[in-house]
Amino acid sequence: MTHPRDLVAGITVPYRIRFDECGPEGIVRTSALLRYAQDVAWIHSERLGFDRPWYAERGLAWVVRAAELGILAPVSLGATLSISTAITGFRKVWARRRTEARLEDGTLALWCHTDWVMTDHRGMPGRVPPEFPAAFAVVPGSFEPGRVPLPPTPSDAAVLVTRVRPQDVDPMGHVNNAAYLDYLEEALIAAGSAAQAAMAATPRRVRLEYVQAAAPSAVLDGVAWAERIDSDPAWAWRLADPADGRDVARGLVLPG
């Protein structure tokens, strides 16, 4: 039996790529990779004693505020990924996880950083309980939370009405963070062939910032356009609430 102290440095779990997780080319969707990352994070937390009842008893929950993925190699239907995860930093209300996925020959196919905020029973940010840095043996203050600042949306941006589907809502009653990746990719499909090529390229990076929660059944405005970030070509994405124009989420797809 694995002793809790052996879990401090992280865990590794195998995942077989399922038929329903792949697109027409037989390659796993980016959102499925992010779903693996959140699932293995839960497994790690549970094995250390921080399961859903533990959080419910204390009125606490983690909410993802930013994610960055590096997709280094295509992963095909039926492949098995060895997915490892570890906490790499804490700061006040924040925690960062790093997740890596390797093919059966050891090739690194994916890395992912997810930045989480601890929230209380009101849904407001609250300090990370002292149990966490102690359990994960991580020194606080060791990372800068991810942000995706974007310029105003240009007039020629592709526009796609985005509807939150019932299957996008997770057990916390939130739109799952991986669903936003589906929304991003749907907007890029609407933007045309160049955007679609960037979305399928390897290596590539995807950066997401979750600005505010989308409500279940919400109808939102998704827009995508070509952009340059530090002289590199990129595709930008914005999801906004049409009622007030405020951003719900922002994203970038960049060369690897």
Language model features with spans:
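Hot-dog-fold acyl-thioester-processing enzymes
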Residues: 2-64, 119-205
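Acidic/His-leaning functional-site neighborhoods
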Residues: 166-250
